Amino acid sequence: MSLRILDMISVIMAVHRYDKYVDISIDSILNQTYSDFELIIIANGGDCFEIAKQLKHYTELDNRVKIYTLEIGQLSFALNYAVTKCKYSIIARMDSDDVSLPLRLEKQYMYMLQNDLEMVGTGIRLINENGEFIKELKYPNHNKINKILPFKNCFAHPTLMFKKDVILKQRGYCGGFNSEDYDLWLRILNECPNIRWDNLSECLLNYRIHNKSTQKSALAYYECASYSLREFLKKRTITNFLSCLYHFCKALIK
């Protein structure tokens, strides 16, 4: 079924630590040109109640903002909890240290509508801790995603917009500490090979890189290897075998 014009969107964000980037991130969502959304914020971890207290003023200023607390610190738990709180069938991801450009939701939603997609990401602009531009990254389009995904994550997680039922059919996020998103995409690919997903080439989010980023950690590669091994044991295809071998080699090199 095609999406209806003027569908409401649920934007989900987990806040594990309140810092100088959180307000910038929230404001970038509240100032979107597409205004028909709710913003679900999960204050998670040991400081969740203090974080929620610091964010409470947003609920008083804008009734689209809803804040919930979760004492479990792992991101995958927070995102699953956020999904259960979403009222609408379309969900957009957002991280608490990134910046969505003003047209992000509008452009993603319209592209999703026009192409009858179930999930869509965008390109990103890498920025450093001071907000200074580093470079642009663009991701594979729909014709290449299924071929590349077993070997490499084809989506920038905080840029994604997807139909809620796509995530629920896979029982949500089940991943580890560094690559819960990649785990989910692999499960979707293997269970729903005809999934309609794509990436906009336009960069619609500023993605902040920190000195302690998990992007290049060995643990992340080992997690990816374990996901590939699981998929190979479920479906013993050449692609899944090569994917498993590739990720284990990457982990060993790291």
Swiss-Prot record:
InterPro entries, alphabetized: Glyco_trans_2-like, Nucleotide-diphossugar_trans
Keyword Iron: no
Catalytic reactions on record: an N-acetyl-alpha-D-galactosaminyl derivative + UDP-alpha-D-galactose = a beta-D-galactosyl-(1->3)-N-acetyl-alpha-D-galactosaminyl derivative + UDP + H(+); alpha-D-GalNAc-(1->3)-alpha-D-GalNAc-di-trans,octa-cis-undecaprenyl diphosphate + UDP-alpha-D-galactose = beta-D-Gal-(1->3)-alpha-D-GalNAc-(1->3)-alpha-D-GalNAc-di-trans,octa-cis-undecaprenyl diphosphate + UDP + H(+)
Superkingdom of origin organism: Bacteria
UniProt pathway annotation: Bacterial outer membrane biogenesis; LPS O-antigen biosynthesis
GO biological process entries: O antigen biosynthetic process
EC number(s) recorded for this UniProt protein: 2.4.1.122
GO molecular function: glycoprotein-N-acetylgalactosamine 3-beta-galactosyltransferase activity
Alphabetical keyword list: Glycosyltransferase, Lipopolysaccharide biosynthesis, Transferase
Known role: Involved in the assembly of the O-repeating unit during O-antigen biosynthesis.
PANTHER family: GLYCOSYLTRANSFERASE, UDP-GLCNAC:BETAGAL BETA-1,3-N-ACETYLGLUCOSAMINYLTRANSFERASE-LIKE PROTEIN 1
Family: Belongs to the glycosyltransferase 2 family.
Other remarks in the entry: O86:H2 and O86:B7 subtypes share the same O unit, but the O units are polymerized from different terminal sugars in different glycosidic linkages.
Protein name listed in UniProt: O-antigen biosynthesis glycosyltransferase WbnJ
Organism from which the protein derives: Escherichia coli
Upper taxonomic lineage: Bacteria, Pseudomonadati, Pseudomonadota, Gammaproteobacteria, Enterobacterales
Gene that encodes it: wbnJ
